[in-house]
Amino acid sequence: MTQISRRKALGAAAATAGVLAPTIVRAQQTTRLKIQTAVPSSSIYFDLLKRFGERVDKMSGGHLKLEMLPDGAVVNAFEILDAVDKGVVDGGYAWTHYWSGKNTASGLLSNPAAGAGTGLDQLSHVAWLFQGGGYALYKKLYAEAMKVNVEPILLQPMGPDPLGWFKSPINSLDDMKKLKYRSPPGLVGEIFKEMGINAVAMPGGEIVPAAQRGVLDAAEWIGPADDMALGFHTVFKHYYLQGLHQSTDVGEVLFNKTAWNKLTPELKAIVETAAMASMTDTYTYNVYRNAAAVQKLKTDFKVEIHDTPKDIFPAFIKATNVIYDREAQKNALFKEILESQRAFAKVVVPYWTKINGLYYNMGLASPNAV
């Protein structure tokens, strides 16, 4: 190699190193984000969130770490969106219906009551999100309707939620009307009130203490495993499994948009992929853990498991349609989302109901039928 060629080669190598060096430095940096959750550390969903964070950590080679904070560590559950928007915390975890006070359309995305009155179950609701245009409407809620500095990502389908826990058994809707009942916030609470039920909202960690003080007669939270972890069985001995109020219930992680935009495209893709993995993780986790929890509640804690009184179902669906149709007249985004769900349901529900009938009848015919 000539002297000139050697100088050119060395110059090219130096130039290449100069271009690559900043990339290498960035790749070696570790970003740490604190995520304020709406669940206590005893919740199984807190554990699932930590598993989500562990996936992000491993997939990023340790360059992105998400620290999960239990409910109330920095702000309480209903303040999470504002805290993420303002950068008080880097991210948050809750459900979209927690922000119903900002826009009622939020409830249609995480937990449309009675499948938005369309017959959509949890899996078909998630199918609407990913195959029916629902995810774009989800993003539109935050970016255009609420105009918050937030990047939202769905990650935990945890329903269907039971009607809930009762101190005394009920046999009808009239019995339930006599009780003070903890329900989710937003339009679901309005639906219960339309039915004549005295419904109040409060964070999950406050429910058992309120029941112990006699403030509540009945309550719903999430499901058998998580509710047992929070000690519901210590104050309630009657559990009603079928609940229309959250026939689906999808959690979300919210990132402060400024913090999110500082992540590389690769790190953003890792978070989004880990969130999709968390979907499967939550589905499979719930099937077994909730079934095992019901057995334990019956055998170890003498909780009586009941079917929900039949007259609650038509009353709930009727009240849902009243509240939703009324809200659609006032809120353009609510109307857009509801119409999208109804159009999707017309295609999916006839087929999916028949398929679900297979599994229902197969279960009844099995030696494990109850």
Feature annotation, model-predicted:
Residues L120-Y138:
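A gly/proline- and charged-residue-enriched helix-loop-helix capping module
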Residues T2-H125, A145-V370:
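N-terminal secretory/targeting leader peptides
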Residues Y142:
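Extracellular C-type lectin-like domains
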